[in-house]
């Protein structure tokens, strides 16, 4: 009788237990981790992120709030790139602070209490600290510490640096060239972009494909847009946009393009008034001169004046006569 070999031997009577043991031995151990399991790679990724953010700079800001603060105390926190942020609120009161609580909010939404919060009480001073990492634009916004039922608060406005342009409208004339300028004080944007506004949206300006525009800047924190051969339709709104690691900031500039007839309009109006006044004076002179040279008109005027004089004299002469008659009758 032939002996069974290979798998046939394993499935023969008496060997089912051995087969199960072999299958269990070849099955991967869950404790060792599955390379396709996201939890298997989460730990190294987190360690890499922590190592990446460990070298970030620290931005620390403080706000002092008292029980007499009727309005929110605000502080601007300007960030160009990812940073560690430490926000601290110090509340001072004259009464006991044992029952005083503090709540942190972002854009008026309560933040979850984690190990990043630290609140201490000492005497009549309550100090609350919130420390976290800002690494994207979604973390920008308003962070507020709210104290007690009266909701006395201090607010930190976290945002990227602001670009600044000319506040007043820039006036230029048809055919000329003009320069629009934007500056970012104490900051270095990664990139500058110019846009022209129309009725519906902002249109990017491509200086490489259109010789009408020249974009340059002598420093990294400023940008200049030169527009050549101006037309009236070139007037309108222009935006300069500064790009940072954490977001963007833009500023609006207004350009007014006038034709050369526009400055002459006030002078033309004055000239029209002068011409009208001279015409009226000439008409008066002509009428007066014509009146002097017309003798018939003068005679008629004299006759009318003579008749008026005679009528008045006749009335005056009749009155004394009536008085004499009355005296004779008596």
From Swiss-Prot:
The keyword Lipid biosynthesis does not apply. Only member of the immunoglobulin superfamily to be expressed in embryonal carcinoma cells, which resemble multipotential cells of early embryos. PROSITE patterns: IG_LIKE. Its main location: membrane. It is a single-pass type I membrane protein. Keywords: Cell membrane, Disulfide bond, Glycoprotein, Immunoglobulin domain, Membrane, Phosphoprotein, Repeat, Signal, Synapse, Transmembrane, Transmembrane helix. Residues 293-311 have a biased composition (Basic and acidic residues). Residues 34-254 are extracellular. GO terms for cellular component: plasma membrane; synapse. Residues 293-330 are annotated as: Disordered. SUPFAM superfamilies: Immunoglobulin (SSF48726). Plays a role in targeting the monocarboxylate transporters SLC16A1, SLC16A6 and SLC16A7 to the cell membrane. Plays a role in the outgrowth of motoneurons and in the formation of neuromuscular junctions. Following muscle denervation, promotes nerve terminal sprouting and the formation of additional acetylcholine receptor clusters at synaptic sites without affecting terminal Schwann cell number or morphology. Delays the retraction of terminal sprouts following re-innervation of denervated endplates. This is Embigin. It comes from Mus musculus.
